[in-house]
């Protein structure tokens, strides 16, 4: 059965859907994340990934990085609505295809199996510059930092080799060169 789409994700005459990374600088206080997420869920916007961390202890600031999908008018509406929330200091939006922005995700992958399969899996992980964090005779845990689609591909390839557990962060983003987007 096909997954129902949100009314906000339907193509319109104003443009087609595209993935966007929305970065929001907020006060680091109780309830702020719930308000930001509530804005998305209350309007039927989907969040594909989410990463949140305090970035300035003195100023009590946190940075929320949200990956979502929508038409240009939906993304504009999301940004406007986020900007109206009291604890929000700044909102930035980047297309996933923006060549000026670096996007990465981190994944921890656990593989368990016989020696031959483990050796094959380790060789495969080296192609992704994976870092082995833990290993035994029957298993290993690897850390991979890459684009979402690259991690998806690695996960699919490792499944038949004994992949038993996956833990992933949401996307994080940073401008290239000396350009900075900050609070």
Predicted regions located by residue number:
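Long, contiguous binding/interaction regions
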Residues: 1-62, 69-183
């Amino acid at each position: 059965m096909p997954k129902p789409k949100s009314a906000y994700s339907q193509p319109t005459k104003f443009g087609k859907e595209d993935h966007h990374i929305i970065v929001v600088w907020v006060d680091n206080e109780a309830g702020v994340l719930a308000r930001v997420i509530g804005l998305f869920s209350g309007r039927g916007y989907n969040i594909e990934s989410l990463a949140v961390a305090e970035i300035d202890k003195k100023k009590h600031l946190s940075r929320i990085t949200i990956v979502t999908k929508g038409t240009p008018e939906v993304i504009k509406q999301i940004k406007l609505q986020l900007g109206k929330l009291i604890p929000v200091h700044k909102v930035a939006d980047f297309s996933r295809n923006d060549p000026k922005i670096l996007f990465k995700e981190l994944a921890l992958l656990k593989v368990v199996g016989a020696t031959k399969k483990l050796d094959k899996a380790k060789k495969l992980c080296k192609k992704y510059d994976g870092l082995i964090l833990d290993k035994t005779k029957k298993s290993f845990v690897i850390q991979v930092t890459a684009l979402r689609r690259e991690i998806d591909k690695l996960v699919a390839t490792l499944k038949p080799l004994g992949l038993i557990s996956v833990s992933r962060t949401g996307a994080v983003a940073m401008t290239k060169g000396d350009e900075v987007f900050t609070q």
